[in-house]
Regions:
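Extended charged/polar low-complexity repeat regions
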Residues: 1-610
Length: 610
C-alpha cells in the first residue's frame, strides 16, 4: 500500500550505527533514547547521592561477551514521540515508554506514558539473564526456581496456584499446589519437539499426532475419538478437518494464503473475494447474503464503503492513523468521531444533536463519559487497573473490591453488597447475596462444577463424561441423565428413568424436532429449512399416548424477501403477517394480509418517534 517505515541510525559518537529514530508510515517520528553501561552507572550514582543513600555496586563497564554472545552494553532507555502530523503542537511531554536496567544490563522495569511502573523483573545473582521473579503493578510477585540445566522446576504464586516441574527424557510432570498432576509426553528434538500425549489430573488421556515437519495431523480426545487435520503440504494451512463422526469441513486459499472458501459440515459455503492488493472486496455468507467492500485509496486497506445484502450502503472515512472518523448510514445520516493524540476516542457526534464525550487519565483509562445534557458518569481504578467504582450522574456509587489477583471479591450496587470467595485455583467457592444468604460451589480436578448448594439450602450435583459433557444431574433426589450423539449433540434427556425431551437432527446436523411428554401425550415441534439453512417452517403436533394418532397440529411458515431478510410469517388458516422494512432492515410497519397493523415513524437515529 505504499507505506514506508524508515529507520534512522546515529552517524557518529558512542551510538554510531545504532537506530535512534523511527518514522512510521503515517509520518510520525519516534526518538529512541539509548544508554551505555557507563551512563547508567553514573545515573545510578547521582540518584543515590540525591537521595542521601550509599551508591550500590553499578560497574561502569560490562564484559564484551556474555553467555548470549557479544554485548556492547547499549540499551533502549525511552521512546519519545517527537513529530506528529495530526498534532504538531500537542506532543507528549513525557516518553511513551521507559525502561530500567540492572547493573548487569538486564531489563528491570517498564514504565508507561504516565511514568507508572507496570512491570518489574528480578534475576538470578549467579546466572546473568535468568529471570527468577516478575510482577505486574498491583499484582503479587511470581517467582521461579531452576535446576542445574536452567529449566524451571518451581513456579511460586503467593496468592494462587504454584507449580512444580519434573523433567524426564521424554516426559514432563507438572504438579500444582492442590496436588493435581499432569504428565506431558513428548517426541522429537529441538524445534520439532511436540507434546504427543497428555495425562490429565483425572487420569484421562488425550493424544496428538504431527507430521514430519511438526504440523498437527490428528487429536484423540479422552473418549478415544479422533479429529483429523489435513494441512497443505507447502503452506501448512489447514485444508480439511474431519470430526470423529466422519463429517468434514474444507478450506481453500489463494496464492496469498487468504481464505477464499470454507465449507462446513452441513455443506454450506462461505466465499471471499479479494482485489489485486489482497483487500477483501466481497464476502458471501453461507445463507447467500453478499457483502461488498469498496476502497477509494490505493494506499489504504480500510474500506470507504460497504454494501450489505439489501443493497444498502454505509460509508466510512478514516484518519491517516486508521482511526474511524465518520460513518454515514444508508439514509445519509452521519456519525462523527474525535480522537486524542493517543488514538483513544474522545467524542461521538450523532444526528439529532446528540454527542457523547469521553475523558481518560494519564494511563489511558476511561475516567468519565458525558452526554450532551451534561450528565456525567465517572470511573475509578486501583493501581492494577481494575475498575473499582462507577459514579452515576445522580451521584450514586457502585463499587467493586478485588483480591490481589484481580478477581472481584465484593460488589456494591444501590447500597447492597454481594461478595465472592475463591479457592487457590481462582474458582468461586462461596457467593454471598445481598441479603446475607450463601451459595457454595465444588469442583472436580479439571475445574468442572460438580456441586452447588443454593441460597435455599438445596443441593444440585453434576457428573461429566471423559470429554467434559454433562451426563447426569441430581437435584434433591431428582436424577436427570443427558445423552448425546457422535457429534456431541444432545439427543434426549431422561428424568427418573423416563424420557423427558428428545432432540432430532437431519444429515446436515440441523435441528429438525424437539419433543416432550405432557400428561402422556407426545408434544413435538418440527423444524424445516431451505437449502440456505434458513428456517422456513415450524409445525407443532400432539399425538395420542397409546395409539400415536395425530390429535392436533399447527404450522407456521416463514418467508424471506429477495435481500434475504425475514419478512413474512404465515400461520395456519390466517392471513400472512408481513414486516415492512427500509434500508438495512429497519422496521417501518406491519400488516396482516392486506390490512395495515402499525406504522413506525423514525428519527435520524432510526428511533421510533410515532
Amino acid at each position: 500500500f505504499g507505506r514506508t517505515q524508515t529507520f534512522h541510525r546515529e552517524a557518529g559518537g558512542e551510538f554510531s550505527g545504532e537506530i535512534t529514530g523511527v518514522t512510521d508510515g503515517a509520518g510520525r517520528h519516534f526518538r529512541l533514547v539509548l544508554t551505555t553501561q557507563a551512563l547508567r552507572a553514573e545515573e545510578a550514582r547521582q540518584k543515590a547521592t540525591s537521595g542521601g543513600t550509599e551508591p550500590s555496586a553499578f560497574p561502569d563497564t560490562q564484559p564484551d561477551y556474555t553467555e548470549y554472545g557479544r554485548d556492547n552494553g547499549i540499551r533502549l532507555s525511552a521512546v519519545w514521540l517527537t513529530h506528529d502530523p495530526e498534532y504538531p503542537e500537542n506532543l507528549p511531554a513525557a516518553p511513551l515508554v521507559r525502561y530500567g536496567w540492572t547493573p548487569r544490563g538486564e531489563l528491570a522495569a517498564v514504565y508507561d506514558r504516565s511514568n507508572t511502573q507496570v512491570r518489574s523483573f528480578t534475576y538470578d545473582d549467579k546466572y546473568r539473564g535468568r529471570m527468577v521473579a516478575h510482577r505486574h503493578t498491583g499484582r503479587p510477585e511470581i517467582r521461579y526456581r531452576y535446576d542445574s540445566d536452567g529449566r524451571v522446576t518451581e513456579q511460586l504464586n503467593p496468592a494462587g496456584l504454584s507449580y512444580t516441574y519434573q523433567y524426564e527424557k521424554d516426559h514432563i510432570t507438572i504438579t500444582d499446589s492442590l496436588d493435581r498432576r499432569e504428565v506431558l509426553h513428548t517426541q522429537g528434538e529441538g524445534g520439532l519437539k511436540r507434546v504427543v500425549k497428555k495425562e490429565h489430573a483425572d487420569g484421562s488421556v488425550t493424544q496428538s499426532q504431527f507430521d514430519a515437519v511438526g504440523r498437527l495431523k490428528a487429536q484423540t480426545d479422552a473418549a478415544g475419538r479422533t479429529t483429523e487435520y489435513s494441512p497443505d503440504v507447502v503452506t501448512g494451512l489447514i485444508t480439511r478437518i474431519t470430526t470423529p463422526d466422519g463429517r468434514a469441513s474444507a478450506f481453500y486459499y489463494n496464492h496469498h494464503s487468504q481464505l477464499t472458501s470454507a465449507t462446513g459440515t452441513d455443506g454450506l459455503e462461505l466465499r471471499r473475494e479479494y482485489d489485486e492488493s489482497g483487500r477483501l472486496i466481497q464476502e458471501t455468507a453461507p445463507d447467500g447474503d453478499i457483502t461488498r467492500y469498496r476502497y477509494d485509496n490505493p494506499h489504504s486497506d480500510l474500506p470507504c464503503a460497504t454494501d450489505d445484502a439489501t443493497g444498502s450502503r454505509k460509508t466510512m472515512t478514516w484518519s491517516r492513523y486508521g482511526q474511524l472518523l465518520t460513518v454515514t448510514d444508508c439514509s445519509g445520516y452521519v456519525t462523527r468521531y474525535d480522537h486524542d493524540r493517543f488514538g483513544q476516542m474522545t467524542a461521538a457526534h450523532r444526528e439529532e444533536g446528540l454527542s457523547q464525550y469521553r475523558a481518560y487519565d494519564s494511563r489511558g483509562q476511561l475516567i468519565a463519559v458525558k452526554d450532551t445534557q451534561g450528565h456525567e458518569t465517572r470511573y475509578e481504578y486501583n493501581a492494577a487497573g481494575d475498575l473499582t467504582a462507577v459514579i452515576a450522574p445522580d451521584g450514586s456509587r457502585n463499587g467493586t473490591q478485588y483480591d490481589t489477583w484481580g478477581k472481584a471479591i465484593r460488589t456494591t450496587q444501590g447500597g447492597l453488597t454481594r461478595s465472592m470467595e475463591y479457592d487457590a485455583a481462582g474458582r468461586v467457592i462461596r457467593l454471598t447475596s445481598e441479603n446475607g444468604s450463601h451459595t457454595t460451589f465444588r469442583y472436580d480436578v479439571l475445574d468442572r462444577l460438580i456441586q452447588e448448594t443454593g441460597f435455599d439450602g438445596r443441593t444440585q450435583r453434576y457428573h461429566h463424561d471423559l470429554t467434559g459433557k454433562l451426563i447426569r444431574s441430581e437435584d434433591e433426589g431428582l436424577v436427570t441423565h443427558w445423552h448425546y450423539d457422535e457429534a456431541d449433540r444432545i439427543t434426549h434427556r431422561t428424568v427418573k428413568g423416563e424420557t423427558a425431551e428428545q432432540w432430532r437432527y437431519d444429515e446436515r446436523g440441523w435441528l429438525t424436532g424437539i419433543s416432550h411428554l405432557s400428561e402422556g401425550h407426545r408434544v413435538t415441534v418440527h423444524y424445516r429449512y431451505d437449502e440456505k439453512g434458513r428456517l422456513t417452517g415450524e409445525r407443532q403436533t400432539v399425538h395420542h399416548p397409546q395409539t400415536e394418532a395425530l390429535l392436533w397440529q399447527h404450522e407456521t411458515r416463514h418467508a424471506y424477501n429477495a435481500q434475504g431478510l425475514a419478512n413474512r410469517c404465515i400461520p395456519d388458516s390466517l392471513p400472512a403477517v408481513e414486516w415492512l422494512t427500509y434500508g438495512s432492515g429497519w422496521l417501518a410497519g406491519m400488516k396482516l394480509g392486506d390490512t395495515p397493523l402499525v406504522d413506525f415513524t423514525r428519527d435520524r437515529l432510526h428511533r421510533e418517534t410515532l
